[in-house]
């Protein structure tokens, strides 16, 4: 797997968008694209070809699970790691997310300044799993 460089953040809350974008750019040096809806995520994914997608679960319109399903139909996103951002982290929720094909889940609220390190740790785990 390549180096983690480009991250697509799909989040409907403007404050969370801004904080996540700033934190990932400053602490991780990543190129970050942000969008607010599942529909925008599909368009951006086609143009941006992200290495990783952070996807809010509860959004108006096309929610996280429906967006994930649509993204998986895009050839350049079929294997892209997708991490759900959500406050819903009960065991039954996590089982459902895994069944959908989500790589990981980050619980809200989270520390934005440690987000880049968390993602890098997750990415190295994906890299080892791919090499195995």
What are these regions, as identified by a protein language model?
Residues 110-119:
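C-terminal output helix
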Residues 34-52, 69:
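Acidic, metal-coordinating helix/loop segments flanking the phosphotransfer/catalytic sites
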Residues 103:
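Short, glycine/charged-rich "phosphate-handling" switch motifs in NTP-dependent
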Residues 11:
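Conserved acidic carboxylate
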Residues 59:
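Receiver (REC) domain active-site loop signature in two-component systems and cognate sites
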Residues 14-33:
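Two-component/phosphorelay signaling modules centered on CheY-like receiver
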């Amino acid at each position: 797997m390549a180096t983690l460089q480009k991250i697509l953040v799909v989040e409907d809350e403007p404050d969370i968008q801004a904080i996540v974008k700033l934190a990932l750019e400053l602490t991780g040096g990543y190129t970050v694209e942000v969008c607010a809806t599942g529909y925008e995520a599909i368009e951006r994914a086609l143009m941006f070809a992200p290495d990783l997608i952070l996807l809010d679960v509860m959004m108006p319109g096309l929610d996280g699970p429906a967006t994930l399903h649509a993204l998986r139909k895009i050839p350049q996103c079929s294997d892209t790691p997708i991490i759900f951002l959500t406050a819903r982290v009960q065991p039954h929720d996590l089982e459902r997310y895994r069944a959908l094909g989500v790589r990981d889940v980050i619980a809200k609220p989270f520390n934005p300044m440690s987000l880049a390190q968390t993602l890098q740790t997750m990415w190295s785990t994906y890299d080892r799993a791919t090499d195995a």
